[in-house]
C-alpha cells in the first residue's frame, strides 16, 4: 500500500511537471509575442524599434498566460476523459470513403471553376518553362510538372487545358487522401459526430481548398505527409499498414521539398528500431531513397556544372543574423568583414535586411553564391565568431526572422506576404510584365472563371475574405495546439502517439532553422491539414481502454 501511495505521488509530480512545462512555454511565447507584435505589424519600419524582451510588463504577460495555459491543459485533459468519442457501431467504410471522395472533389471542382485553370506562382511557372531549370526547386517536382504539362500541351495545343488537367489530377489525389483519412478514423471507432467534424474542418477550411487548386510543391508535400501519418500510427502500434501508400507518400515527401529527407530519415530510423517485423521493408525503402537521391545529386552536378544553391538555401538564419549585426553596427573584426563583404557588399547587407524575410539578401544580384559555396567552412566560422560578440543581436534577429512560426498573436493581414499565402491567379507573386507573366502570355495561359460574371465576382469576393479570416489560425496557434495535445498524451503515457506526432515537430524544426520566411502561410500548410488528425487521435487515445 505504501508503495502504491509513493507511485501515485510520483505520478502526480510528473503530471504537474508536464502541465508546468506546457504552461511556461506558452507564457514565454506570449511574452515574446507581446514585445515583438508592434514590430511585426509595422514590419516596414521595424528597425526603429528598440525591443526589451524581459521587463515588468513582459513578465506580467508571461505570468498571466502561464496561469491561463495551466488552467487550459487541466480542463482539456479532464474534459477529454469525460467525453466519449468512440462508437461500438461499425461503419460502412466504403460509404465513408466514396461519399467523402465525391463531395470533396465536387467542392474543389467548383473552386477550380472559379479560378480556372488553377493557381500557382513563379516557382510553378519555372517548371513549365523548361526541363529542370534550376537547383532551387526539387528536381523530381520540376521534371514531373514539366513532363506532364508539355506532353498534354503537345497533344492538345492548349496550355489552359494542359494546366487544368494537372490540377484536376491533383484534386483527385487530394480527395483520395482525405477520403482515406476519414475511412481510417472510422475504422478506429471514432464517433460519427467527430467524424463529421473532421470532414467539415477539411472541406470548409478556405486555405485548404485554396492550396489544393494551386500547383505548389507545398501542396504535394502536405498531402503526402497527411497520407503518411495514419500509416506511421499503424506501424508504431503494430497494426496493419498500407505499404503502397507508405511508399508513395515517402517518395513524394522526400522529393517534393528540400526538407523532406530531414523529416523522413529520423522517422524511418525510429520505425526501424521499434517495428522489428517491418525492418526489412523499411531498410529497402530507405536504401532506395538514398540511392535515388544520390543519383539525382550526381545528375544535378552534371547538368549545372557543380553549381549548387542548397547551402545558401539552408543558411537563412545565419544570413539574417549577420545582416542584423551589420545594420545595428555590431562588433565585427576585419577578418570577419573580409568574408562577410565577399559574399555581399556592406551597403547591400544594410539595404536588404528585412523582418522575417531573407530573400532580398540571398537573391540580390550582388550576392556571390559561388564564393559562398566554395568557402562554407570560413562562412560558418565567421558566423560563429560573430555570435560570441553579438549574442543579443543574434537572438533578436532570430526572433524577428522566426516570429510567424511561434507568435500567439493573430496575423495582421497587412504584414503577411499574401502573394505566397493566398493564391488567386497563375502568377500570384509576380506581375504580368515579369518574365513569368510574359511567358504565360506567350502560351495564352491565363485565369478565366467558368462561372457567370456576376456569380464570379460575388463568390471570389467572399472566398478571398474567407481566406484572410483563415489566416487568423496562425502557425503559432496551431503549434500551441500540437504542444497541448503532446503534453496531454505524454501525461497519459501514450508514448506511441507521441512518436506519431514527431514528423510535425521535425517539419516545424526545419522551419525554425532554415525557412526563408515566417510570414508566408503556405510553409505551414502541413500543420493546417494535419491538425484534425492530432486533435482526433489525442482525444481518442487518452480515453481508449
Residue map of PLM features:
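Loop-to-helix entry region of an early transmembrane alpha helix in multi-pass inner-membrane enzymes
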Residues: 57-59, 143, 147, 155-176
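Extracytoplasmic catalytic/substrate-binding loops of multi-pass membrane glycan-assembly enzymes
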Residues: 115-128, 136-152, 157-161
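Transmembrane-helix motifs of polytopic, lipid-linked glycan transferases
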Residues: 165-188, 227
Amino acid at each position: 500500500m505504501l508503495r502504491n501511495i509513493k507511485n501515485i505521488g510520483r505520478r502526480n509530480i510528473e503530471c504537474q511537471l508536464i502541465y508546468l512545462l506546457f504552461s511556461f512555454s506558452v507564457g514565454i511565447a506570449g511574452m515574446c509575442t507581446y514585445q515583438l507584435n508592434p514590430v511585426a505589424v509595422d514590419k516596414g519600419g521595424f528597425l526603429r524599434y528598440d525591443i526589451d524582451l524581459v521587463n515588468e510588463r513582459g513578465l506580467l504577460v508571461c505570468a498571466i498566460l502561464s496561469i491561463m495555459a495551466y488552467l487550459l491543459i487541466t480542463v482539456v485533459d479532464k474534459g477529454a476523459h469525460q467525453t466519449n468519442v468512440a462508437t461500438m457501431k461499425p461503419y460502412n467504410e466504403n460509404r465513408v470513403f466514396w461519399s467523402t471522395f465525391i463531395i470533396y472533389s465536387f467542392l474543389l471542382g467548383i473552386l477550380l471553376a472559379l479560378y480556372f485553370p488553377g493557381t500557382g506562382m513563379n516557382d510553378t511557372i519555372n517548371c513549365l518553362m523548361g526541363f529542370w531549370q534550376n537547383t532551387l526547386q526539387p528536381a523530381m517536382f520540376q521534371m514531373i510538372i514539366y513532363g506532364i504539362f508539355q506532353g498534354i500541351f503537345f497533344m492538345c495545343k492548349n496550355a489552359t487545358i494542359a494546366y487544368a488537367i494537372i490540377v484536376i489530377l491533383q484534386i483527385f489525389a487530394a480527395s483520395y487522401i482525405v477520403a482515406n483519412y476519414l475511412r481510417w478514423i472510422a475504422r478506429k471507432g471514432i464517433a460519427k459526430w467527430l467524424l463529421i467534424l473532421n470532414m467539415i474542418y477539411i472541406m470548409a477550411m478556405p486555405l485548404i481548398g485554396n492550396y489544393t487548386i494551386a500547383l505548389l510543391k507545398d501542396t504535394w508535400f502536405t498531402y503526402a505527409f497527411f497520407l503518411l501519418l495514419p500509416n506511421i500510427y499503424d506501424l508504431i502500434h503494430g497494426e496493419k499498414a498500407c505499404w503502397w501508400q507508405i511508399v508513395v507518400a515517402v517518395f513524394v515527401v522526400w522529393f517534393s521539398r528540400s526538407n523532406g529527407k530531414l523529416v523522413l530519415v529520423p522517422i524511418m530510423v525510429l520505425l526501424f528500431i521499434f517495428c522489428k517485423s517491418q525492418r526489412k521493408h523499411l531498410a529497402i525503402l530507405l536504401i532506395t531513397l538514398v540511392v535515388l537521391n544520390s543519383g539525382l545529386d550526381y545528375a544535378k552536378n552534371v547538368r549545372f556544372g557543380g553549381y549548387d544553391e542548397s547551402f545558401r538555401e539552408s543558411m537563412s538564419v545565419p544570413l539574417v543574423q549577420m545582416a542584423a549585426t551589420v545594420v545595428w553596427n555590431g562588433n565585427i573584426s576585419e577578418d570577419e568583414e573580409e568574408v562577410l563583404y565577399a559574399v555581399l557588399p556592406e551597403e547591400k547587407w544594410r539595404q536588404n535586411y528585412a523582418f522575417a524575410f531573407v530573400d532580398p539578401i540571398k537573391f540580390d544580384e550582388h550576392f556571390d553564391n559561388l564564393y559562398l559555396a566554395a568557402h562554407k567552412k570560413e562562412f560558418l566560422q565567421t558566423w560563429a565568431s560573430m555570435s560570441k560578440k553579438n549574442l543579443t543581436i543574434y537572438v533578436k534577429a532570430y526572433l524577428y526572422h522566426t516570429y510567424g512560426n511561434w507568435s500567439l498573436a493573430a496575423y495582421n493581414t497587412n504584414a503577411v506576404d499574401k502573394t505566397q499565402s493566398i493564391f488567386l491567379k497563375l502568377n500570384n507573386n509576380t506581375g504580368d510584365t515579369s518574365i513569368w507573366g510574359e511567358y504565360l502570355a506567350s502560351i495564352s495561359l491565363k485565369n478565366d472563371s467558368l462561372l457567370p460574371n456576376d456569380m464570379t465576382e460575388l463568390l471570389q469576393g467572399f472566398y478571398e475574405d474567407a481566406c484572410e479570416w483563415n489566416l487568423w489560425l496562425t502557425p503559432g496557434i496551431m503549434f500551441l495546439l500540437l504542444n497541448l495535445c503532446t503534453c496531454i498524451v505524454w501525461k497519459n503515457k501514450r508514448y506511441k502517439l507521441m512518436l506519431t506526432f514527431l514528423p510535425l515537430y521535425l517539419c516545424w524544426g526545419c522551419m525554425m532553422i532554415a525557412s526563408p520566411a515566417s510570414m508566408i502561410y503556405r510553409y505551414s500548410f502541413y500543420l493546417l491539414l494535419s491538425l484534425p488528425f492530432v486533435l482526433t487521435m489525442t482525444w481518442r487515445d487518452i480515453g481508449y481502454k
